[in-house]
């Protein structure tokens, strides 16, 4: 009798323990906020890949998944459509969506870099050699506006450029076929183009960095942020920790990015070394002037016909200020 009672007690205790574990897991799951982050399929979003893979987002209460797009602004369109919670793009595509009525906010700048490069035939030795040449880039992307600024900086009239709209994944192929003389994009397409062209192409110097520096803005739906203010702060805390991880664990970061992008780990490590990405999370009011310049260019080129979006309303510094006021400059 005693033996049977003990068995029953053991089984009951085991069952109770199992239920307790399930309840604990359920409680954890219920406290997590689902966040679908988007990223351009390139090495520049490595901090997000780290947050997903190393459990940093989950640590801060975020049930995160990073969705890859060919280019960052497609992620912004997904946010506008309610198919994602975050995106990261530069000024031009963001301004275009704002002008069309997208109600987006920017809690932080999350990537700063000199990552855009001009891959050109070796016969193009200096900026002015681009006049009359066929140059590929993604219309409406960061490369579009950055290359325009580059031409302006180096005295090349825009109507002298034969612009060709080519998706990132096809740029190397169209150059190899001889359909274009140069293209403007970032890694890993820069190195891939150099490898395929086998000495017939180079990275043009001076480069885009003489005219434009990439700032990638964390973009979110205003409605979502206002309904999930604690989660917004938690997401920013997680991104700050992602930056710290990248700085402390460069090799592990390369391995994670390589797996996400389906490239060799050594290639990812090399790209991270050669491209000066800064994943520090901050918000600088200087960005408002950049947006103002973009708006002028858009209007002059027929890309902005209505009222200029109110950029002051777009920036929401209060969430980052809760974490670290020193990261918020000029607001």
Language-model features: where?
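Conserved C-terminal helix/tail region of periplasmic/extracytoplasmic solute-binding proteins
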Residues: 298-331
